[in-house]
């Protein structure tokens, strides 16, 4: 339909396995390097470059099965936060080291650095919320930023989502910061910049069967999910995938994504010149503290 355009529909796409790996880097490795070695992994987007490199190389060095299990035991560790789960994660890293030692692609150093995170893992896990792996919250936040670039104010209606409903007060509070300033402030760096306060006017929740807009969004989102899942698996000969691919404009609906690429240079990542190593979370916290003074 001519009514379905990027001006009316926007989507955030998450590669879940890659997102898990980025969480390992951001939640475990980054604090170890920063607090123990005074090294800023966010400088020039090195955290993203490392995530891209490891996602491509780990399966080649240790095998896809060991890599998938690595992501699985990390997920379990973050959910359970128990001594048993922590032990299972670091024991699996030892198994990966043994496999890497037999590989023509040397990755022992990278695995050894990950093993060193055992020094800070309990502190890191303590700070992780239960929703840490749920993409709904960062996706909604990013969509609010995108719609705010298109509209002075807007209302949001979301389907019944427990993680989002639990954060409703947070999003409303960020939007209400407009009362403290007429102009938005840009935080972050390069292609990770966002504008705050959010231009969100109201936030409401509705069952999908009560909202035509949510039902239409569900259909479009399902099509995108199918398309990118098949693309991720390399199943590009699938009949429905080819029909979707033949449309030629699905990518136009994606306003942002967490997806692996082969980009490893600051310029390719859109972070060239970010010598300060801007951490989006820290920039956001600084913004809130400044407004609350």
Where do the protein language model's features map onto the residues?
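Phosphate-ester processing/binding pockets and catalytic centers
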Residues: 1-293
């Amino acid at each position: 339909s001519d009514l379905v355009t990027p001006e009316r529909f926007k989507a955030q796409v998450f590669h879940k396995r890659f997102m898990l790996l980025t969480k390992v880097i951001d939640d475990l490795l980054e604090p170890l390097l920063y607090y123990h070695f005074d090294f800023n992994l966010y400088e020039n987007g090195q955290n993203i470059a490392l995530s891209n490199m490891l996602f491509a190389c780990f399966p080649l060095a240790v095998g896809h099965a060991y890599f998938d299990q690595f992501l699985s035991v990390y997920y379990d560790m973050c959910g359970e936060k128990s001594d048993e789960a922590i032990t299972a994660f670091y024991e699996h890293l030892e198994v990966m080291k043994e496999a890497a030692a037999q590989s023509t692609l040397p990755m022992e150093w990278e695995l050894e650095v990950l093993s060193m995170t055992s020094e800070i893992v309990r502190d890191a896990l303590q700070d992780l919320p239960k929703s840490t792996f749920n993409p709904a919250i960062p996706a909604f936040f990013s969509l609010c930023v995108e719609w705010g670039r298109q509209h002075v104010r807007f209302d949001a209606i979301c389907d019944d989502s427990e993680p989002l409903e639990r954060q409703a007060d947070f999003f409303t509070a960020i939007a209400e910061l407009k009362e403290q300033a007429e102009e938005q402030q840009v935080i972050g760096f390069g292609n990770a910049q966002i504008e705050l306060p959010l231009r969100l006017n109201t936030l409401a929740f509705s069952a999908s069967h009560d909202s035509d807009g949510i039902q239409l969004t569900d259909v479009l989102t399902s099509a995108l999910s199918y398309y990118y899942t098949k693309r991720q698996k390399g199943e590009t000969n699938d009949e429905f995938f080819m029909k979707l691919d033949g449309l030629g404009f699905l990518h136009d609906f994606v306003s942002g994504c967490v997806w692996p690429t082969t980009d490893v240079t600051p310029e390719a990542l859109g972070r060239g010149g970010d010598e300060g190593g801007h951490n989006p979370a820290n920039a956001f916290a600084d913004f809130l503290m400044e407004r609350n003074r």
